[in-house]
Design a protein with these regions (language model features):
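Conserved alpha/beta catalytic core and glycan-binding cleft of carbohydrate-active enzymes
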Residues: 1-134, 163-205
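Catalytic cores of secreted or luminal carbohydrate-active enzymes
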Residues: 146-171
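A short acidic, glycine-rich active-site loop
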Residues: 96-98, 142-149
Length: 205
């Protein structure tokens, strides 16, 4: 970083090593960001459940907030989630095609609102059906289908909403930038929380 100011150094860690993004001078490894692989695992486990079973597994969704501020996290959808028989993001969701697409839209909505930088995987934004194959290109022909075009539009609009609303990305490593309003106690199918920016402005989600 001394040679290239502003460069990002992103770590991936599975062994539970702490202080990945703490400066070296303070005993850390000095990465600017770290993949939050625990978040990805919890989200895939939760959203892959049929809707009628999610209420009984809400802890997978809610617990992710308890560790969201341990590092400067990136919420990753990496290629590792979509190869070797793990299926595409769309195919991880239960139900018929329309239900799968609704699930993906819901997932991306939660992801955009949750603390942490975002990293999606190519094709997920329009509902790629096949898992990733480096021998072939993305299934662009799917965009001839209205449902896939609508998903692409939805994700594009979510990106615009994210960029326009400072509470969704400012000061997000600070625990004070997030608090639960209702973590599913009133209705286990609905969670509500607040995001707060550096000026104290709130966005209710």
């Amino acid at each position: 970083q001394a040679e290239v100011p502003g460069a990002l150094m992103i770590g991936e860690e599975f062994a539970g090593f702490e202080n990945m993004t703490l400066p070296v001078l303070h005993g850390g490894l000095g990465f600017t960001h770290m993949w939050n692989v625990r978040w990805t695992e919890a989200m895939m486990n939760y959203f892959s459940l049929a809707p009628e079973y999610r209420a009984y597994n809400l802890d997978r969704l809610v617990f992710s907030a308890t560790t969201a501020f341990e590092e400067d996290y990136i919420l990753p959808l990496s290629y590792k989630e979509f190869v070797y028989g793990k299926r595409s993001l769309l195919e991880k969701f239960p139900g018929l095609e329309a239900e799968k697409m609704a699930g993906v839209r819901s997932f991306f909505g939660f992801m955009m609102a949750f603390p942490g930088k975002k990293m999606s995987f190519m094709g997920s934004e329009f509902g790629q059906v096949s898992q990733w194959d480096y021998h072939s290109q993305l299934e662009w022909d799917l965009l001839e289908n209205e449902g896939h075009r609508q998903m692409q539009t939805c994700i594009r609009e979510l990106n615009h909403i994210y960029a326009r609303n400072c509470p969704l990305w400012q000061d997000e490593s600070n625990k004070g930038s997030f608090y639960w309003i209702d973590p599913g106690r009133t209705d286990p199918d609905v969670v509500a929380f607040s995001r707060i920016d550096e000026e104290g402005d709130e966005l209710l989600v």
